[in-house]
Amino acid sequence: QLGYQAESGAWRNAYLVAAFELRNGTGLYPKAAQLGVGTTAQGMDAQTMLDYMGIIMDTEKLQDRSFTINLKLTDADDYLLKLHHGVLLYYKDALSDEADLTISTPRIGILAITSGNQENIDKLITVEKGDKALFQAFCDSMAAFDLYFNIIEP
């Protein structure tokens, strides 16, 4: 009843989500939304996708490694990615001849890496130069978020 009586949208949403969680749990949400590749994500530009990649990267998996990646996007600008001790930096239109890895992909291939979808990674991304094991380590460093966590229950 509190959810229907609250005037504030934020309070109303909190009460109604809590009631839904108590009745149904948190496992009833669509699986596609958990992957982070919905229409909103597909509409992001390359820089926003790379920012997202930097956010979800598990820095502890690559904390002892430093390498560079030439990212050639077939439908957007090219980027130089530098990974130094688990921190991802990117530079627009700054490819390097000395990069450890060169990959080519459409912009949506960035989302394939962030979602960990190996089928789409194989389909969309081409390793032009460099060690494929390094590319796999880069892909494996992406953390999988649990988007649907409990709001009111511990």
Model-derived regions: residue spans:
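Feature captures hydrophobic
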Residues: Q1-P154
